[in-house]
Amino acid sequence: MSMVDLLHFRDVYPTDLSTGYKRAVAIARALAAQPECILYDEPTTMVDPIMSDILIHLMLKLKHDLRLTAVVVTHDLDLMRRVADRVVFLYEGRAIYFGPVKDLEKCDHPHIREFLAMDRVEMVPGV
């Protein structure tokens, strides 16, 4: 619990925790088994931006402090860029790219180009 900075929640019932903190508790439970690898499945989906940032910082801390290999399943380009060194990009159940995150921009697969272009969509205020 201390490794994931949750000691102040030790007397709180799980039903009283937010979705984000429930995810942090799930990470703490997984770490109790001292794994060599951890799977994060859409770790920041459906949480507010502050909790998302807390979870991302936690993932980066564990990566650094424990040298823990992580597999992150996500559709969130920002999350991928912040936490991943390498990426496997799947399309129709097949890997169409495997390599450094920084080189993903150079990939010419149309589905990857489309995915990356979605990150550049400008939001119109009030719409």
Name every feature range the model reports, one short phrase each:
Residues 80-82:
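A short, surface-exposed alpha-helical micro-motif characterized by mixed small hydrophobic
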Residues 1-9:
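Conserved ABC ATPase "signature" region
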Residues 74-75:
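H-loop/switch region of ABC-family ATPase nucleotide-binding domains
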Residues 13-17, 21:
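Conserved ABC ATPase signature
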Residues 34:
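Conserved catalytic motifs of ABC-family nucleotide-binding domains
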Residues 38-41:
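Catalytic Walker B motif of ABC-type/P-loop ATPase nucleotide-binding domains
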